[in-house]
A protein has these predicted regions:
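Active-site/acyl-donor-binding loops of N-acyltransferases
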Residues: 30, 36, 45-70, 74-149
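Amide-forming acyltransferase catalytic core, primarily the GNAT-like/NAT-type
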Residues: 1-58
Length: 149
């Protein structure tokens, strides 16, 4: 399953995604699903907003099956095309924990504007499980924070 690609990530169930994005009356999100053989193999959530004279597009969330060659490329190109057609001058996203995707974003001329340290604390977990967690397999996007507006 797609969610098993990471040690730690938000559970992206249908109920959660509807609560987080589609049932929000205060913000308009654009949701895209990607299929292969009639099965969802990825999705992305976009938002646009105006700040001063700039219209920005945010790729709020992107989740995909890493085993499908070029799926991430297709998602990002499709998202950029959609945002461009909707008059966005800049595109931003946060992506923590997927180095392959970050490398591909660099090839698409995205650049790192700032970084945020990943800080974690063990609460109720066996020590051996905690030691086996790999910070590079903690997956976070802009949609996993409270900072989206």
């Amino acid at each position: 399953s797609i969610k098993n690609q990471y040690n730690v990530c938000v559970e992206r169930s249908k109920q959660f995604l509807n609560w987080r994005y589609t049932n929000r009356p205060d913000v308009k999100y654009f949701l895209f699903e990607y299929y292969q053989d009639n099965k969802i193999v990825g999705y992305s959530v976009l938002k646009k907003y105006k700040e001063k004279k700039i219209t920005r597009g945010h790729i709020i969330d992107v989740f995909y099956n890493k085993k499908i060659l070029n799926l991430f490329d297709f998602i990002i190109k499709s998202n950029c095309n959609f945002l461009y057609k909707n008059n966005c001058q800049e595109i931003e996203l946060w992506l923590q924990g997927d180095t392959v995707a970050v490398n591909k974003l660099n090839k698409f001329n995205f650049y790192v504007k700032s970084t945020r340290p990943l800080i974690g604390k063990k609460l109720l977990m066996e020590e051996k499980l905690f030691k086996n967690l790999n910070k590079n397999k903690w997956y976070f996007t802009m949609g996993d924070t409270l900072e989206i507006y």
